[in-house]
Structures are given as C-alpha cells and as structure tokens.
Amino acid sequence: MKPVKKKKTEEPELEPLCCCEYIDRNGEKNHVAACLCDCQDLDEGCDRWLTCQSLRPETCERITDTISDRLRIPWLRGAKKVNISIVPPLVLLPVFLHVASWHFLLGVVVLTSLPMLALWYYYLTHRRKEQTLFFLSLGLFSLGYMYYVFLREVVPQGRVGPTQLALLTCGLLLILLALYRAKKNPGYLSNDKSPSNSQIECPVKKGQEKTKGFPGTDASGSLNNRTLKDDVRGSSRVGLDSPAKVKEDWCAKCQLVRPARAWHCRICGICVRRMDHHCVWINSCVGESNHQAFILALSIFLLTSVYGISLTLNTICRDRSLFTALFYCPGVYANYSSALSFTCVWYSVIITAGMAYIFLIQLINISYNVTEREVQQALRQKTGRRLLCGLIVDTGQYNRGFLRNWLQFSTLGTHTVHTPAEDIV
C-alpha cells in the first residue's frame, strides 16, 4: 500500500483587530470595554487594604503592569497603549492651579508643594534608572495650558495688542521646534565596528579564560592596566602625558569602542558621544548632536516666559513694576479670572527660575569646556578646581580658554575625531 501523505495543517490566520481591540501582555485578545473586568490583583489589593493587611511588593507591581497594559485609546488596527506617566500632569495640573486660585494661602501651599512633588518623583525614577514621560508631559502641557489661560483670561481685557500676541505665539512655536530638534539623536554610538575590532576572541592561555574584547584582556577584564569596571564607571580617557590626545575606551555593556568624553547612559541603555547629562524634561540624553539645540530651547523658553509673565502682570496689576506686582497686587483675588492668571504667573515664575538655573550651569560648563557628567565625577572624586562653593568646576582637561571653548561648542557635531582601535591596545 502506498503511504498516505499527511496534509499540512494550515495555521489559522489572525483576524484583524478592530479599533477597540488589542493583544494584552498575556498574548490574548482583549477589548477596551473590558478594562475593569478580571482584575484579580486589584481585587486582592483592595481586600488586603480593607482588612488593614500589608500589600506585597509583587502585587503592587502586577497591579501597575495591569493598569498600564489596559490604559489604551481606540486606534486604527487596534487600540494603542498610553504611557501612564503622561496622565498625572494632564489631570492634576489644572486641578492644582484652580484650587490655588481660590485663596492666597491655598496658593502658597499648592505652589510650594508642586516643586517638592516633582523632585520626589524625579528621585524615585532616577533611583530606579527608568525612563519616564512625566516631565516631558508636564513641560509640554504647562506650555499649552499657560497659553490657553493667557488667551482666555488675559487677552480679552484689551491690554495685549496683536503684535504682542503674535510675538508670544512665535516664541511658543520656536520653543516647540527647538524641543523637537533637541529630542532627536543626541549622538548615539552604534556598534558598526568590524568584528576584528569590536569582537576579538582572545586565545586561551594557562590561567586565563576565553574572553571577548581586545587582545590581552584576561579573565578579570583588565584592559591596558584598567578593568572594564573602571571603564563603565568612567575612568579618564585622556593620557596624563598628553592631555590633548584623544583615546578611546571599550564599553562592556554596548560592546563597542567609545571615543573620549562619550559615556554609557544607564537610563537610555546606550552610549552617547560627548554626553553631558540625561535630561528628564526631554526624556533623552544631551550629547554632541543635540547640545546646541538644548541650549537654544532653554534660551527661547526663558525669553518667551519672561515676556508672557510681564504681559500678564501689566494686565492684571496695572501701573506697577514687574517685580513689585509679583509680591504686591491688591485686589487680585477679587475675581476668579485675575486670581487664576496671578496663580499661573507664579507657577511660570517657579518653572522659569528652575530653567534659568539649568541654563546658568550650562553656560558655566560650556565656558570651562566641561560636561555635567565630568563635573559630577570631579565633585565625587574631589578633583579639579572648584569656585563659588562648587558652582564652577574646572577639571583642566579640556579647558582651552573662554573663546576657544565656545568656538568648539559652536562646531559640535560638524566633525568627529576617530582614532583607530589599535592605537589604544
């Protein structure tokens, strides 16, 4: 008898998702309308809370994961997941500002608490080394909401002309354009080296293990009398005998050769060329390719913010100077419109003061040709020259004078110095 050929079982084709359906974290099809169904972890957490029992950490993590997975909006070909960290600013900021405009004392309490809550959340996420869209959402929504209050409460009073409104609108648009440019690639290092340079398998010697890296790297990971741990922690990449000579280091995490002043960002999980710092306000690193756009965004924001604050105070506190109106504006709480505008002014002042401090630090660092990461490393290791209680730190490694430092900053990203890997072995 001839053997019977078995027919190949055809896998069923997946049906296209409608706008409200999605594939959840368990790989099953789910619906947006069922977001409150089958919440075992949430039920368990509520039961333990009602019975005054402690909630286990793993239960809290599962509840957070479930909420973030089910928080979606209808979209074409399936519901899209919404990052839960962008929601609190959209909901809480208008509520807090409206509550603060009810009374002077409420305004003091709320406007004092907001920076503290933001700092608490920053240190919480910074300690976990996690990316968050909270601060980017807070910044963008603050810009939009302040502009909305200005159009609704300040412009109708007739003291803001069309030219002034056009200037403020152009400033807002320029801020968004500069932020868009600053959000782009800060100078990520890609692992495009050849295998002979980036992944060299060392021969096995007696007393050594097979490792990947540069020739001469033993089992302890030493490289040129330094360990890979030192490279990850940020050992100096400038030779003592020739400070101007650029050397390159090996990143054990990205498995690539990084040039001088590059650093591995533990939040982004990738190496950045001439990394300055990881900025939570743009949810990205500030590096060689976007440092100029970052400074431009800060400068435009400060000018636009001060201009908007002055226009608002001249409208609600007439015939008073800008500084006097901030602290003494009689009758500002007499009606709700002026009270809300005055509260938004003080909120803008707090944000502007914080950004002005960041801008000042950036100007000082550029003038001394140091990055923020190099400053923090010098403060920890108690090296370099410190002035004004550590506000100014000069490491002395790359400082070539004020004009040359700014000239080098103005040409960032236009050329890149490459050093062969053989030169550092």
Curated annotation (Swiss-Prot):
One term of GO molecular function: protein-cysteine S-palmitoyltransferase activity
Keyword Transferase attributed: yes
Mode of membrane association: Multi-pass membrane protein
Alphabetic keyword roster: Acyltransferase, Golgi apparatus, Lipoprotein, Membrane, Palmitate, Transferase, Transmembrane, Transmembrane helix
Tissue occurrence: Expressed in the brain.
Presence of the UniProt keyword tRNA-binding in the record: no
InterPro entries: Palmitoyltrfase_DHHC, PFA4/ZDH16/20/ERF2-like
Residue span of region Interaction with NOS1: 422-425
Subcellular localization: Golgi apparatus membrane; Golgi apparatus, trans-Golgi network membrane
A GO CC term assigned to this protein in UniProt: Golgi membrane
Pfam family, one: DHHC
PANTHER family assigned: PALMITOYLTRANSFERASE ZDHHC23 (PTHR22883:SF475), ZINC FINGER DHHC DOMAIN CONTAINING PROTEIN (PTHR22883)
Function noted in UniProt: Palmitoyltransferase that could catalyze the addition of palmitate onto various protein substrates and be involved in a variety of cellular processes. Palmitoyltransferase that mediates palmitoylation of KCNMA1, regulating localization of KCNMA1 to the plasma membrane. May be involved in NOS1 regulation and targeting to the synaptic membrane.
Record's comment describing the protein's domains: The DHHC domain is required for palmitoyltransferase activity.
Similarity field: Belongs to the DHHC palmitoyltransferase family.
Protein name per its UniProtKB record: Palmitoyltransferase ZDHHC23
